[in-house]
Amino acid sequence: MFQASKTHLDELQLKRLEEMCIVIDKQDQIIGADTKKNCHLMENINKGLLHRAFSVVLFNMKNELLVQQRADAKYTFPGHFTDSCSSHPLYVPEELEEKDALGVRRAALRRLQAELGISQDQISIKDIIFMTRKYHKCQSDAIWGEHEIGYLLLVRKDLMLNPDTREVRRCCYMSQKDVQELLDREARGEEKITPWFRSMVEDFLFSWWPHLEDVSSFVEPDKIYGL
């Protein structure tokens, strides 16, 4: 069944399935490592396998949010609209560092470059604000799913983009009104949105949006929502 479920994956996505994710408990304490494939198989998720992840919400200086549509070759939620960049820190020393979420923020820099072509001479660790954490569990299809504690990271900066079409079908900046209209279209069955993006928008982004010039009052690094 797994073999049949990966026929839409390209060489890049198949290679990434062998990357080592950080396995955690529900307090976000590291307890080991496992492959990205194993972490996203529903048979393992249903046994409790949980890993660390992150989502970046990237705003330009006009306070528009970069929304991407995931490539059709993605193993979970292909073709769905979602946040600016979401992925996983890897089980490597530089991405395991927990002080100030440095490891996760380094992983975000890596994936912003890989997915969106944002070179690291444009953006630094200091540009990435660790806002809070959110637990989520969702099923993509009979084989694949997500079971993560995601670090919510915020960037507000004008950046040059060069998306990798193997990762991103398309992306565009949206106003708060545009995002609400996207959610409304999804509710009518006209669009597909990842479950974590919908909950992120409704639980956090609409509250943060009017305060993007200074989000310090919303920073909750010790909190894990959704548990």
From Swiss-Prot:
Active-site feature positions: 86, 148
Magnesium found in the keyword field: yes
Protein's pathway: Isoprenoid biosynthesis; dimethylallyl diphosphate biosynthesis; dimethylallyl diphosphate from isopentenyl diphosphate: step 1/1
PROSITE patterns: NUDIX
Bound cofactor: record note: Binds 1 Mg(2+) ion per subunit.
Domain Nudix hydrolase: 49-199
Reactions mediated catalytically: isopentenyl diphosphate = dimethylallyl diphosphate
Pfam families: NUDIX
Gene Ontology process terms (BP): cholesterol biosynthetic process; dimethylallyl diphosphate biosynthetic process; isopentenyl diphosphate metabolic process; isoprenoid biosynthetic process; negative regulation of cholesterol biosynthetic process
Residues at which Mg(2+) binds: 40, 51, 146, 148
NCBIfam families the UniProt entry points to: IPP_isom_1
Name under which the protein is recorded: Isopentenyl-diphosphate delta-isomerase 2
Species for this entry: Mus musculus
